[in-house]
UniProtKB/Swiss-Prot annotation:
Protein's name in the database: Cobalt-precorrin-5B C(1)-methyltransferase
Any GO molecular function: cobalt-precorrin-5B C1-methyltransferase activity
GO terms of biological process kind: anaerobic cobalamin biosynthetic process; methylation
Record-stated family: Belongs to the CbiD family.
Protein's organism: Nitratidesulfovibrio vulgaris (strain ATCC 29579 / DSM 644 / CCUG 34227 / NCIMB 8303 / VKM B-1760 / Hildenborough)
Spans traversing the lipid bilayer: none
Record EC number: 2.1.1.195
UniProt keyword annotations, A-Z: Cobalamin biosynthesis, Methyltransferase, S-adenosyl-L-methionine, Transferase
Gene: cbiD
Region Disordered, residue ranges: 1-25
Catalytic activity: Co-precorrin-5B + S-adenosyl-L-methionine = Co-precorrin-6A + S-adenosyl-L-homocysteine
InterPro entries for the chain: CbiD, CbiD_sf
HAMAP family: CbiD
Signal peptide location: none
UniProt enzyme class: transferase
Amino acid sequence: MESRADHAVPADEGHGATEPPRGRDRAALREGFTTGTAMTAGAVAALRHVFGLPFLPVLSVPLPPQEGVGVPGRLGVPVAEVLTEGDGATGVVIKDGGDDPDATHGARIETHVRLLPDATATLLLEGGTGVGRVTLPGLPVAVGEVAVNPGPRAQLEFAVREVCAAQGYGGGVRVTVRVPEGEAIARHTLNGRLGIVGGISILGTRGTVRPYSHEAWKAAIAQELSVARALGHRRACLSTGRRSETLLMRRYPDLPEQAFVQAADFVAFALGAAAERGFEALAWGCFFGKLVKLAQGLPHTHARTAPLDLPLLAQWCREAGVDEARVEAVAGANTAGQALDIITPDAACHTALDAVTRRAKAHAERFAGPGVGVTIHLFHLNGTELTSA
């Protein structure tokens, strides 16, 4: 899977990139392949060219080796072209993310290989134009190294050794991966915040891209939290998307951007992952709809799987002293935003919002586990903070 670092991020309170668009069946979505698989296929194509083998428009390449699995699975990957370049060759693959909202979809991945006959069975991996380099701790790649994750590295090594062995070649190979538009693409990802500079990352735990993968989102949330903790931060500020994060940043102006993580709908996972990494204090910023769902105790808040319980919200409003006519209107509202508009003029509005926020806080601290305090910040779409607890 690719990481969320290469995905579009949710704007808040809508249908973000964690779920397919309305009317699209997840099972019918087309899978793609990762940047790691693109790099590997390019390397295989280039090696074949160097060894004098014929060009194949589709190559069967190994997927990343998995623990406990002896022989990796394989995938057919289209190859755009192979070019002789210097004393080696370059294989070109156009990244295909399938139906996933992936910033790297359509990117030209160029993998240059050069044989090193005097370097016995050595694979040297380098990053060229458009491939990032790691500058912050907490990532699975060491500081100073090219941003190619362990999965793609193992995938590349397996494939290179496979081709070389078939040709009876026991020397070394230098592999340089390039993404000509990588630096521009990276501006639409979270790489800058993660301290990956100069381009995109080469990613892929499985080698294939599952559209709107929850696992990819969770892996990226965990990665961002790991970077923040490795930098020594004790507070993490989690939000549901871009707008709530921007408002949360204004609320905590002394914290660097690495302390802020967009968790989308994965509230329980994100809070638990933050607690596991040793954060002492957490903040959660959201708008009213996500707040109500958290107050309901829902661990995942996307509309497709987590319905808003407006009759329950109405009951909470009644308990807070909201006028009965407004309570009934809240129960029959179409959206959380409409319910908030109904409550706002009432004298008991602030009491009601405080009560809902306290319920959300209780569930957030349950998700985080004992000993971790969570502060909830409720924002209005106009940018004001309505309450906190």
